[in-house]
Swiss-Prot record:
Subunit structure: Component of the large ribosomal subunit. Mature ribosomes consist of a small (40S) and a large (60S) subunit. The 40S subunit contains about 32 different proteins and 1 molecule of RNA (18S). The 60S subunit contains 45 different proteins and 3 molecules of RNA (25S, 5.8S and 5S).
Membership in a protein family: Belongs to the eukaryotic ribosomal protein eL24 family.
Superkingdom as given in the UniProt entry: Eukaryota
GO biological process: cytoplasmic translation
Organism lineage string: Eukaryota, Fungi, Dikarya, Ascomycota, Saccharomycotina
Name of the protein described by the UniProt record: Large ribosomal subunit protein eL24
Species name: Candida albicans (strain SC5314 / ATCC MYA-2876) (Yeast)
Compartments, record wording: Cytoplasm
Role according to the record: Component of the ribosome, a large ribonucleoprotein complex responsible for the synthesis of proteins in the cell. The small ribosomal subunit (SSU) binds messenger RNAs (mRNAs) and translates the encoded message by selecting cognate aminoacyl-transfer RNA (tRNA) molecules. The large subunit (LSU) contains the ribosomal catalytic site termed the peptidyl transferase center (PTC), which catalyzes the formation of peptide bonds, thereby polymerizing the amino acids delivered by tRNAs into a polypeptide chain.
Length: 155
């Protein structure tokens, strides 16, 4: 004796009971009662209808043997070296006090600022030297050859 399962409610359908619905794409749906068939045709979600097996499963109703819970794997963080920084260097930086780190950052910023200022001064001096030597200052447009208007010759 083959016992079928209701496509909507999940309840058992014994031989000689229920109806069969074959959709246009040849998928077969079995319904235990006209109630579940009607709800299926209304496109109701069986997980939201409280008497269906799917609802009970979804809301964990009537499950008494919950002793064996599923074991989940815990993710463990590992420190690994990055390209350009060894593990020791990373650990050393992590263990630094925030005040020390801030002081190091400030000193580096000051050093970079000084280097930038020096480079700017050097460029300025080079430009002044070029002007003093009497080199003619040519604008970019003149160097390219500015647009020359063609004179009309028809008159």
């Amino acid at each position: 004796m083959k016992i079928e399962v209701d496509s909507f409610s999940g309840s058992k359908i014994y031989p000689g009971r229920g109806t069969l619905f074959v959709r246009g794409d040849s998928k077969i749906f079995r319904f235990q009662s006209s109630k579940s068939a009607s709800l299926f045709q209304q496109r109701k979600n069986p997980r939201r209808i409280s008497w269906t097996v799917l609802y009970r499963r979804h809301h964990k109703k009537g499950i008494s043997e919950e002793a064996a819970k599923k074991r989940t794997r815990k993710t463990v963080k590992h420190q690994r070296a990055i390209v350009g920084a060894s593990l020791e260097l990373i650990k050393e930086r992590r263990s630094q006090k925030p005040s020390d780190r801030k002081a190091a950052r400030d000193s580096k910023l000051a050093k970079d600022k000084e280097a930038k200022k020096a480079a700017k001064a050097a460029r300025k001096a080079e430009k002044a030297k070029a002007v003093a030597s009497g080199a003619s200052v040519v604008s970019k447009q003149q160097a390219k050859g500015s647009f020359q208007k063609v004179k009309a010759t028809s008159r």
